[in-house]
């Protein structure tokens, strides 16, 4: 699978990932940042691209939650 095909698959999950993040954070800028990090995380997983659409969505949600949790723990440690 070439990079253009991988980018297309990631684009298919972009809005969904942002929606998940926004639902949990309720802040546009932080949601955008968390969604970007989550998509980069799943992009590093070669199995992601050969998984079913449902499997990909589950991985996107898990990555989004991980990124949000990580960002919040980083934020708490700064305070």
Map each language-model feature to its residues.
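Short, charged helix-capping/linker segments at alpha-helix termini
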Residues: 1-7, 18-37, 50
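Sigma70-family region 2
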Residues: 36-54, 75
């Amino acid at each position: 699978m070439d990079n253009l095909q991988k980018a297309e698959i990631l684009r298919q999950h972009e809005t969904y990932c942002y929606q998940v993040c926004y639902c949990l954070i309720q802040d546009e800028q932080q949601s955008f940042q968390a969604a970007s990090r989550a998509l980069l995380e799943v992009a590093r997983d070669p199995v992601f691209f050969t998984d079913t659409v449902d499997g990909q969505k589950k991985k996107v949600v898990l990555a989004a939650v991980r990124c949000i949790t990580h960002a919040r723990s980083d934020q708490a440690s700064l305070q």
